[in-house]
Amino acid sequence: KRSEPNRTPSDVAIMVSEAVELAEIELRRRNVRLSHYVAARLPKLLVDPILIEQVLVNLMKNAAESIDHAKRATARRSVELRVIPRQLDGQSVVEFSVMDSGQGLAPEVMERLYEAFFSTKAEGMGIGLNLCRTIVESHQGRMQAENIYNGLDVIGCRFSFWIPLSDATNSIVTPNSSGAGVSA
C-alpha cells in the first residue's frame, strides 16, 4: 500500500522558493534563465511540501533539459514558473505551471508521457513524470502537458498541475463562538 502524503498546511511561496533554489543549480549549469511568479496572498495548501517541491524541481529540470536538447540560443533559454489561484469547475485550486522554450513534445511522446519507465533521455530511469503525476493525484490534483505554439510552430511546452484548496485550508483560522480567531 502506498503511504499517504504527510500533509500539513503549507505556504506556497516557501515551497516555490525552496524548489527554485534546488532547481537553479541545474538550470545555471545549462545556462537557462529561470523566472518565477507567485500570486500574492495565496491560501496555505494542505499538502506534503517535500513532495510538491519534488514535483516542481523535476518539472523545472525537465524544462531545462528540453531547452538544452533544442540547442536554443542564449536569448531563448528560459523557464518560467507561475503559481496562481484558479476556479476549475466551481472548485478553487492553486495552479502551478512550468513553461519552457524547448522543442515541445512530439505526439507519440505526449501519449506515453506518464508511463512508468518511459523516457526520451539517454540517462534517467523514466520515473520522473510518472512519479510526479502520482504525487499530484495523491493530493487530489491533476497534471497536464501541452505544447506552446506561435502560429504553427511549437516554441515550447507547458507542464501544469493544480492542487485543490481543501475545506480545511480555507478554515485554518475560524472564528469560534466568541468571535475570536482560533488556529486549527
Q: Which stretches of residues belong to each language-model region?
A:
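A conserved beta-strand-to-alpha-helix junction within the catalytic ATP-binding
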Residues: 8-20
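Conserved catalytic submotifs in the C-terminal HATPase_c
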Residues: 28, 33-43
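Glycine-rich ATP-binding loops of the HATPase_c
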Residues: 140-150
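A residue-level detector for a conserved hydrophobic packing site
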Residues: 52-53
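Conserved micro-motifs of the catalytic ATP-binding
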Residues: 1-5, 44-47, 120
